[in-house]
Swiss-Prot record:
The lineage of its organism: Bacteria, Pseudomonadati, Pseudomonadota, Gammaproteobacteria, Moraxellales. PANTHER family: MITOCHONDRIAL TRNA-SPECIFIC 2-THIOURIDYLASE 1, TRNA 5-METHYLAMINOMETHYL-2-THIOURIDYLATE -METHYLTRANSFERASE. The keyword Hydrolase does not apply. It comes from Acinetobacter baumannii (strain ATCC 17978 / DSM 105126 / CIP 53.77 / LMG 1025 / NCDC KC755 / 5377). This is tRNA-specific 2-thiouridylase MnmA. Residues 94-96 are annotated as: Interaction with target base in tRNA. Its main location: cytoplasm. Catalyzes the 2-thiolation of uridine at the wobble position (U34) of tRNA, leading to the formation of s(2)U34. GO terms for cellular component: cytoplasm. GO terms for biological process: tRNA wobble position uridine thiolation. The active site is at residues 99, 201. SUPFAM superfamilies: Adenine nucleotide alpha hydrolases-like.
Length: 377
């Protein structure tokens, strides 16, 4: 009996080719287009209608049914409110990770099951191993890096539980991006030459600062140097991220050297932005970080007293960094991570993701690091 797969079709080339490949592999395939954001401002930036039209054109071309589902309420409750709270607290969140965990897998999978699906599928560049069982006897599928190292998306998928990975197929995870484009052109799919989306799912391509100030009032404050000297005004700490180069408004400052300016520290308590020159400024360097809650793909992870040796990324596409993970005795579910080498601009609110060779073990949101605090704070 044919197994039924519902593919999350975004109107992009990766999910389009995923659906086509699954058909070729003999599955009974249907598509589902998720609407996760209600356009509230009438700007030209929202591409949801265009994306739906592209998904429908591909579905028609390959001869499958396309369902639609509106998860905007779930998105607002489970993703967007957290996103705003993190920015309001001075951190820099990654909503795409939470969106994958709560919407693109959990809500989508639940909905697909009501439609009689055996599996869901997405266009992510990732792979899954055969079903395994954790110590509680729960079935899960280990998450593996995508074959295309340049496109691997496990960093964004680390918070998806292995029981959901166990019900998911990743057709393009086994091939490289140029081959995906070639297949789309060969099949004459409407999305073959469509450029990859780069914006946060609900912001699209619009200016981030303009979007954010619709929801959070800007709180301007002082810009200070690493010695505490005031040199200007910032527009609101939420608009800046640790390690950011440029966009600070200090170009050509009198008496300063020609070098680029970097965000070194966000003094949230006093609403001050600390800046300085030097790509590897000491205030940006850390060797340890703490995370208060980890999502392990297997639902658990044994961490011995001497620590778990693995590699980690603290941002997408960063080369793997060797580290040791310890249980944080001061937190119920947290960990402390010690890196073998100093790390630059590790940013609270972003995620640390752990790997053992090809296997993505899981990860969590960075709470704080041991980067030095400016001595005037």
């Amino acid at each position: 009996m044919q197994q039924r797969v519902i593919v999350g079709m975004s109107g992009g080339v990766d999910s389009s080719v995923s659906a086509a490949l699954l058909l070729q592999q003999g599955y009974q395939v249907e598509g589902l287009f998720m609407k996760n954001w209600e356009e509230d401002d009438g700007t030209e930036y929202c591409t949801a209608m265009e994306d739906l039209a592209d998904a429908q054109a591909v579905a028609d071309k390959i001869g499958i049914k396309l369902h639609t589902a509106n998860f905007a309420m779930e998105y607002w409750d489970r993703v967007f409110e957290h996103f705003l709270a993190e920015y309001a607290a001075g951190r820099t969140p990654n909503p795409d990770i939470l969106c994958n965990k709560e919407i693109k897998f959990r809500a989508f999978l639940d909905h697909a099951m009501t439609l009689g699906a055996d599996f869901i599928a997405t266009g992510h560049y990732a792979r899954r191993a055969e079903t395994a069982y954790n110590s509680k006897g729960e079935a899960y599928a280990p998450l593996l890096r995508g074959l295309d190292n340049n496109k691997d998306q496990t960093y964004f998928l680390h918070a998806v539980h292995g029981r959901e990975i166990n019900k998911t197929l990743f057709p393009v995870g086994e091939i490289e991006k140029p081959e995906v484009r070639r297949i789309a052109e060969e099949l004459d799919l409407a999305t073959a030459k469509k450029k990859d989306s780069t914006g946060i799912c609900f912001i699209g391509e619009r200016r981030f600062n303009d979007f954010l100030k619709q929801y959070l009032p800007a709180q301007p404050g002082k810009i200070v140097l690493d010695n505490g000297k005031e040199v200007g005004e910032h527009h609101g700490l939420m608009y800046y991220t640790l390690g950011q180069r440029g966009g600070i408004g200090l170009g050509g400052m009198k008496g300063a050297s020609e070098g680029a300016w970097f965000v070194l520290h966000k003094d949230v308590a006093n609403n001050r932005l600390v800046v300085g020159q030097g790509h590897d400024h000491p205030l940006m360097q850390s060797t340890q970080l703490w995370s208060e809650a980890i999502d392990w793909v297997a639902g658990e992870q044994n961490i011995p007293a001497e620590g778990l040796r693995c590699t980690a990324k603290t941002r997408y596409r960063q080369p793997d960094q060797a580290c040791t993970v310890f249980i944080d005795e001061n937190s119920e579910h947290g960990v402390r991570v010690e890196f073998d080498e100093p790390q630059r601009a590790v940013t609270p609110g972003q995620s640390v993701v752990f790997y053992s060779d090809e296997v993505c073990l899981g990860g969590g949101v960075i709470h704080h690091t041991n980067a030095p605090t400016p001595n005037f704070i």
